[in-house]
């Protein structure tokens, strides 16, 4: 008699794990889906296998919570299910951040019944709806040979792709004959009036163009009908914007000619946060747990590491090491229009923009290109606004609240790529936040005021 446990920690149960159960003839009691190096009861599932019926099209979409990706994919399922003789299936996977977090949509379509009650591991089509993900997640490797990869980015030129794509992605695309396409959904969203963050219908249209599940003209017609049904109560203007976005999405997909040089790329590059500092509890948690979980590799964390946090508590301050870089637009400071009100840092929900009081010596230690003004009312001190674009979510609250000087705002929301290009912008933030609080500055402006309060952060 054998007995085992599965689905521990809500983990997905795959065909490879079930096969491992049937092959097991040693462990009377076992677990699957986890790496148990404490009791050593876990079974090694080995390589993932495909059990979907032949001809089934598997798709995976990586989106950002609240960007509309999940809603668009639910519409896609309805369109295909209602207008073809195909079977359709969809699973949606979210992280705990919800809005602003990672969403993964797993879609399957086929002529035969689909009984795959698990997430897509090997896909015919993968779409990356946020360009920051390409350096954080191992998504291209989920494609089967000859599969299609769609990347939403603003740097779809040969030079931009050469600069931004990590070597392991280039190599995989080349070696596995991946059909690679790009689209600038943010630009299209702005041009069609949808805005920079509501890119769902744009990328849905691009998907139907590339997937060849339904003829492109019919798919566009069905999408427009769905837009009329969904947004009709909000007015014809909203419907027209969605229809324009649908047309533009299909027309602006760009095929990338993969150069032979990509097959010679070496090494791997991922934007993985590595913690350091005096707080060992934070450093250990970030490096052993958080970095892997944020990289969608949490299922590989062994039980011995997880058991360290058996009581459920985690150290505070670990979010500072995430540096997700998910914002579409980030604030850029124009010091000439700044009145030093500190409203911007006061309203920022993620502490991604900070107002700093610096001594002359500290100002001299700031990276080259950092603008430091004389702090009004405090001779001998300098004032600077520093922005962490990698922590910013692009909400725009800072720019909206900024009174500026004579109506000219001191903060302008700029595309992330342009904001990050400011001289030593991220390094200025990392340097400034390490300086101590100036007690005499806080006493001058009073801790009970907005300005005084922000100099205590």
Residue locations for each model-derived region?
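Generic marker of residues within folded, mature protein domains
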Residues: 51, 97, 117, 323, ...
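Active-site cofactor/cluster-binding pocket
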Residues: 1, 8-9, 55-65, 69-291, ...
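Structured core elements
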Residues: 1-2, 31, 58-63, 71, ...
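Hydrophobic alpha-helical segments, principally membrane-spanning helices and signal/leader peptides
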Residues: 48, 53, 109, 115, ...
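Short, Gly/Pro- and small/polar-rich lid/capping loops
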Residues: 39-61, 449-456
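A cross-taxonomic marker for long C-terminal extensions/tails that follow the last structured domain
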Residues: 7-53
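Short hydrophobic/aromatic-rich motifs at helix boundaries and adjacent loops
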Residues: 47-50, 195, 221, 316-317
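Ferredoxin-type iron-sulfur electron-transfer modules and their immediate structural context
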Residues: 219, 232-391, 399-457
């Amino acid at each position: 008699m054998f007995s085992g446990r599965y689905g521990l920690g809500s983990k997905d149960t795959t065909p490879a794990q079930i096969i491992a159960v049937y092959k097991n003839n040693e462990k009377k009691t076992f677990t699957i889906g986890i790496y148990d190096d404490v009791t050593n009861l876990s079974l090694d599932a080995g390589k993932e296998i495909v059990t979907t019926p032949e001809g089934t099209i598997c798709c995976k979409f990586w989106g950002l919570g609240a960007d509309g990706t999940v809603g668009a994919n639910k519409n896609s399922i309805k369109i295909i299910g209602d207008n073809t003789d195909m079977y359709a299936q969809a699973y949606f996977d979210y992280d705990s951040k919800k809005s602003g977090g990672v969403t993964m949509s797993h879609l399957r379509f086929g002529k035969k019944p689909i009984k795959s009650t698990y997430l897509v591991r090997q896909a015919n089509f993968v779409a990356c709806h946020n360009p920051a993900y390409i350096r954080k997640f191992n998504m291209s490797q989920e494609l089967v040979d000859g599969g299609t990869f769609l990347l939403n980015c603003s740097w779809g030129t040969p030079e931009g792709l050469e600069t931004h794509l990590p070597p392991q992605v280039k190599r995989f695309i080349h070696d596995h004959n991946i059909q690679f396409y790009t689209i600038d959904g943010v630009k299209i969203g702005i041009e069609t009036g949808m805005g920079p963050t509501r890119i769902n219908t744009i990328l849905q249209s691009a998907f139907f163009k590339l997937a060849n599940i339904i003829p492109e003209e019919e798919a566009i017609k069905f999408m427009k009908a769905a837009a009329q049904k969904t947004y009709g109560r909000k007015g014809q203007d909203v419907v027209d914007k969605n229809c324009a976005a649908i047309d533009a999405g299909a027309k602006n997909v760009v095929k990338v000619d993969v150069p032979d040089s990509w097959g010679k790329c070496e090494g791997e590059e991922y934007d993985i946060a590595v913690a350091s500092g005096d707080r060992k509890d934070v450093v250990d948690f970030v490096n052993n747990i958080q970095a892997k979980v944020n990289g969608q590799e949490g299922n590989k964390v062994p039980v011995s590491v997880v058991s360290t946090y058996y009581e459920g508590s985690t150290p505070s301050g670990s979010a500072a090491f995430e540096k997700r870089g998910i914002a579409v637009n980030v604030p850029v400071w124009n010091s000439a229009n700044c009145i030093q009100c500190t409203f911007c840092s006061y309203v920022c929900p993620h502490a991604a923009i900070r107002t700093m009081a610096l001594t002359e010596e500290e100002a001299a230690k700031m990276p080259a290109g950092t603008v430091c003004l004389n702090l009004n009312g405090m001779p001998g001190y300098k004032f600077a606004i520093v922005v962490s674009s990698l922590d910013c979510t692009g909400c725009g609250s800072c720019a909206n609240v900024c009174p500026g000087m004579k109506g000219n705002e001191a903060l302008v929301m700029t595309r992330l790529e342009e904001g990050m290009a400011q001289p030593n912008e991220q390094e200025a933030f990392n340097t400034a936040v390490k300086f101590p609080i100036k007690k005499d500055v806080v006493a001058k402006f009073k801790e009970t005021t907005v300005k005084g309060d922000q100099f205590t952060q």
